[in-house]
Amino acid sequence: MQDNEIFEKVQDIVAEQLGIEKTIVTREANFSSDLGADSLDTVELVMAIEEKFAIEIPDEDAEKITNLSEVVDFIKSKLNTISV
């Protein structure tokens, strides 16, 4: 799966979960300060991403992820591990 494809899927999830326009969900947008996500929103985002990509994001990793770019990198690393 390509970087852009992952980004677009995550962008859709974030926009839908937070009820915001897809255009403001950029790679560098911070979930809390830029997109207005609270801690419950973040948990729901992680769960939706885990379900969409059939991966598990451990809590300690989820706490470090603050924007879409970091999510995309994490998903790519997980998918590469699975396919190897």
From Swiss-Prot:
Species whose genome carries this gene: Porphyra purpurea
Residues of the Carrier domain: 4-79
PTM annotation, UniProt: 4'-phosphopantetheine is transferred from CoA to a specific serine of apo-ACP by AcpS. This modification is essential for activity because fatty acids are bound in thioester linkage to the sulfhydryl of the prosthetic group.
Main subcellular location of this protein, as a coarse class: plastid
A GO CC annotation given for this chain: chloroplast
Domain of life: Eukaryota
PANTHER family: ACYL CARRIER PROTEIN, CARRIER DOMAIN-CONTAINING PROTEIN
Protein name: Acyl carrier protein
Pathway: Lipid metabolism; fatty acid biosynthesis
A Pfam family: PP-binding
Keywords, alphabetical: Chloroplast, Fatty acid biosynthesis, Fatty acid metabolism, Lipid biosynthesis, Lipid metabolism, Phosphopantetheine, Phosphoprotein, Plastid
Stored InterPro entries: ACP, ACP-like_sf, PP-bd_ACP, Ppantetheine_attach_site
Localisation per UniProt entry: Plastid, Chloroplast
